[in-house]
From Swiss-Prot:
This is UPF0637 protein llmg_1936. Belongs to the UPF0637 family. Pfam families: DUF1054. InterPro entries: UPF0637 (IPR009403), UPF0637_domain_sf (IPR053707). Disulfide bonds: none annotated. SUPFAM superfamilies: YktB/PF0168-like.
């Protein structure tokens, strides 16, 4: 599980130095939790194969990443081309999202579906949304409808929906509770995900 050291990594200066710590400290946690999320997904959607990915930030040449993430998708060679699940970390929180980022192939179809779904009624109010995977800012679930409409109208718009866990909770005392909440987050998002995969 993540620890306070996981969050301190984002204070390290320099691309190589920060990436070295991300690889040694954060990516093994992604793999550990990711396998549990993968098992949960595979049990709930048994007729679909899922693949686990870890962001490598290979295109970066100068700036160290301000966050990092892993993803679960139905594609072996990538994840951004479709709606997918993400487990990631910023300097002050960990998140799990159902993500539509970087102009997925069915962006307009996703937007149309989500605009007509009563998503706010399908999820508990502690769920939040992100409109840009490169920024730490999040918005309440009440902002979902507007963001879903924007996904259909603005080519470069993004939409992620899920939960976050503030860094203060990662003191080693709540690890099993946090993991249970993560699995439950996937379960709550599954009905939405399954509808997205049908479009």
């Amino acid at each position: 599980m993540f620890t306070q050291k996981s969050f301190e990594i984002f204070s390290i200066d320099g691309l190589e130095a920060r990436m070295a710590e991300i690889r040694s400290e954060i990516q093994p946690v992604f793999s550990e939790i990711g396998q549990k999320l993968l098992t949960e997904l595979s049990a709930k959607i048994s007729n679909q194969e899922f693949y686990f990915h870890i962001a490598q930030h290979r295109r970066r040449t100068a700036n160290a990443p301000e966050n990092t993430w892993s993803a679960i998708s139905t594609k072996a060679r990538g994840y951004k081309m479709e709606a997918h699940f993400q487990l990631g970390i910023w300097e002050d929180y960990v998140f799990i999202y159902l993500s539509m980022i970087d102009q997925p192939k069915k962006q307009k179809e996703y937007a149309e579906l989500l605009t007509n779904l009563s998503v706010e009624k399908m999820l508990t109010e502690d769920f939040i949304i992100s409109k840009d995977h490169t920024k730490a800012e999040v918005f309440p679930l009440s902002a979902f409808s507007e963001a879903a409409e924007r996904l259909g109208k603005v080519k470069k718009s993004e939409l992620e929906i899920g939960r976050l866990w503030p860094k203060e909770r990662f003191d080693g005392k709540e690890d099993s509770k946090i993991l249970a909440e993560m699995l439950e987050t996937i379960d709550q998002l599954l009905p939405i995900y399954q509808k997205l995969m049908e479009v």
